[in-house]
Amino acid sequence: HEGSLVFLKAVIASKALEKSVQSVLSLLYHSPDSQTTTVPTTRSVTLILRSMPGVAYTTGSDLDDDHKEIHFSLDYIHGISESRKKDEIMGVLTHEMVHCYQYNAFGTCPGGLIEGIADWVRLNSDLSPPHWRKEAGGKWDAGYQHTGYFLEYIEHRFGKGTIRRLNEKLRIKKYHEKQFWTELVGRPVEQLWGDYSDVLDKEK
């Protein structure tokens, strides 16, 4: 598949995977030696490049959920513009790698928040694509960059390490929205979303 050649020319697979893991761990966790660091028990990540619709997805392998698989579309890779190939491949890999190493409140975390955290990590790895925009229409947990930029606002407002604390909170208990956000930053998420919307209005 021509997408395979594009991938192999753009990145060295082993280094690309290693770099994306480092980005995820440095943004979502304290240093490995810290007693407060509890990284998930992911034992392996297998990258599978294949022809398929869409962009990419991550799943547990048939062995068990500690072995992850990232499926990345060769058709999508082939269609990336020349100037964006490396950054887009690294951006997608980093986003998917978050799903291998993030917590989800025992399966109760909203999907939009899960995807927002992944794009927040991508954003903070300097891999955001040029078409991403901050927007405050709709719901805060619509996911992806929509939620990713909102999380970036929260990180700046409440201090570096806030999203790391959010991920840790998703490790230890189930997600009950009002309680979760009030315990994390002292106010409900709807209020934060309103504040964020006001900030974006002022930036226009």
Regions found by a protein language model. Name each.
Residues 147-148, 154-204:
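Pan-zinc metallopeptidase signature
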Residues 27-46, 105-111, 131-134, 162-169:
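Surface-exposed patches in mature extracellular/periplasmic domains of secreted proteins
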Residues 22-33, 98-107, 122-127, 155-159, ...:
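Sec-exported extracytoplasmic/periplasmic mature domains
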Residues 12, 16-19, 23, 88, ...:
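Extracytoplasmic/secreted proteins, especially bacterial periplasmic and envelope-associated proteins
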Residues 50-104:
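Active-site scaffold of zinc-dependent metalloenzymes
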Residues 3-14, 76-84, 88, 104-108, ...:
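Second-shell loop/turn segments in exported
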Residues 1-71:
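Auxiliary, metal-adjacent structural segments of Zn-dependent hydrolase domains
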Residues 105-153:
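Post-HExxH zinc-binding segment in Zn-dependent metallohydrolases
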